[in-house]
Amino acid sequence: MIVKEYGKSNKDIIMLLHGGGLSWWNYEEVSEILKSNYHVILPILDGHSGSDRDFTSIESNANEIIEYIDNNYNGNVKLIGGLSLGAQILLDILSKRDNICEYAIIESALVCPMKMTNRLIELLINMSYGLINKKWFSKLQFKS
């Protein structure tokens, strides 16, 4: 897993998980603001622009983040925030380790299965997945 870091290493740690089709740069502006008071960690989720591997599952990303926090921050950080896909990964993290962070911000997580749209979503993902690694497409999506 590749991570971007902002701020001094002796500060409270905030980890922000970007949404699908986005990447670490989604939080670049807010990280510049937070870095004077916090150490900000921005993991690049698997399969997204700048990552070192293909996306496999929410669970594997969650396990990788738990391992990263265990290995680098003694198993606990101040806050983890997640947007969309990042929020779903965060929910999986919290279901496995509810004490991994003092605070959690969950934005736009899919928490109730939508059975009727699963087939449509699968088709659309298969058609558009190649665009997820294109930075120009991610930035265009972010602007909307």
Regions found by a protein language model. Give the residues of each.
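Active-site micro-motifs of SAM-dependent methyltransferase domains
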Residues: 22, 47, 87, 111-112
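Active-site signature of alpha/beta-hydrolase-fold catalytic machinery across serine-
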Residues: 29, 92-96
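Flexible "cap/lid" loop of the alpha/beta hydrolase fold
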Residues: 95, 101-132
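Active-site loop/oxyanion-hole signature of alpha/beta-hydrolase fold enzymes
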Residues: 41-81
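Structural signature of beta-strand start/N-cap positions in the alpha/beta core
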Residues: 13, 39, 77-79, 102-103
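Conserved HGGG/HGGXW glycine-rich cap/lid loop of the alpha/beta-hydrolase fold
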Residues: 6-52
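Helix-loop "lid/cap" segments that line or gate small-molecule binding pockets
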Residues: 109, 136-144
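Gly/Ala-rich beta-loop-alpha elbow adjacent to hydrolase catalytic centers
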Residues: 82-90
